[in-house]
């Protein structure tokens, strides 16, 4: 027993010595004259050969900083700001436009409430809550299904740049249709206005579906270095330009741009109330014009990667092999993914993808790892179907709740802005306050913990909605039929801001971590498509919301809030149990990826194989 304890005490020192010897050995083998170890994207007097890849010892010892970020990256973020500002400014007023009937005394017939009506909301078509909920959910559903097409086109056929260009075109046409739908003649003929609105919704969804999955990957493409690089400063100090931290900074700026744009929907909320819907729909189009202008200016400075058609071809072939034969048995015994590994295929005598046509196997073992990681990520994404419902996924119900409360001259759809405002405030607090504090005390706030914590916080927003809706029913002059009551309940609508604040706080943990996992566990050539797979969860949420639309009416609205809140909390518990060892799985995946990289490099050097495979996945987009 004494001997065993002694060995256990000394083992870390032995491991450390062996590790240090290994690093020294690897450093000795490092070729400082090999041009492959240098990048000439940046050259100066202190770095005459360019930036250099770090040795293993340098990777552990040198100070790490954020690398040079091109101004074109920030210009693309401005494009995202303008696109999201126009999108949210439009969608934020759709509920009032569709649900509420125009007041007979509305000035000029534009939909604004008459002067002297502090608690009245703007209205136009008067189609009711169910129609408003159905169409807003249709917009959400289509806006997050079209990215699957946009991601495929961006990765495999027309490329990301052309996909974005077509998205801009469809988006501009959509804003024109919204303006046509808001003129007095269209509002007076509610069916005509509704038809124009539906066309605009479909067109806007197509534009968003082409832009959204391709713009963020294009932004990340602008970072010049593919790996960590060593830079010598004028002081003589050598530092590492950390690719992970640099991509994290870019992504945070991008995410901040999204929410600043979303916050600007406050302008259209007041436009619809003070003037009418034509101005409320015209302002987003003006914002949208920024997008093509900035894209035209920044185009010559962009690094645009061509589409890689072979990627999707290989994915389809791999899936065909995986689901051939008795795949159910392989799923059961844990050999499902091994079946498509070229090494396993050769071992069982399969040297062609298609024996009859003698089609060659065009992928490597690492392809299987990449696709497996993508599918594993999608398992987590499935939980976001419920999360999105809690995260203002039933926006029409929340807007309707606020409309039944005392507004005191504030537009009922203004409160949606508490979501982006909370994110704008909270993200810097997390990045520069909470997370560094946790690191100081060596508390590892693991990805699965962040996601589950976000789910719990977001579920509290629906519990708050349950309490408020119950209070409205109890205090409204119309009792449990308060939605369309002419007199509001004597409860200040500002209390409803808690719904949006809590949901946004949950989003800061759950959403940003999901982006991180999506990009960490997917090959770069499939970034757009994997991002689209995450977005499509919102489409499933919208479909589920459409399914429960018949229940979205008095006197049952408070039970809807409670059910979604409890479902979100339950998802957090189940997901934590299922993915408790997620960090260990990710570490094993990283080790497996490095092993496959070494094997393929050795085989290529020996001339055994010449296989194109994806470059390494982005390590993280959020630290």
Curated annotation (Swiss-Prot):
Gene that this sequence comes from: PTR2
Annotated region (Disordered), positions in chain: 1-20, 31-58
Transmembrane intervals: 134-154, 163-183, 191-211, 250-270, 277-297, 385-405, 418-438, 448-468, 499-519, 529-549, 557-577
Organism name: Candida albicans (Yeast)
Membrane recorded as keyword: yes
Protein name: Peptide transporter PTR2
PANTHER family tied to this protein: OLIGOPEPTIDE TRANSPORTER-RELATED (PTHR11654)
GO molecular function: transmembrane transporter activity
Summary of the function given for this chain in its UniProt record: Uptake of small peptides.
Family according to the record: Belongs to the major facilitator superfamily. Proton-dependent oligopeptide transporter (POT/PTR) (TC 2.A.17) family.
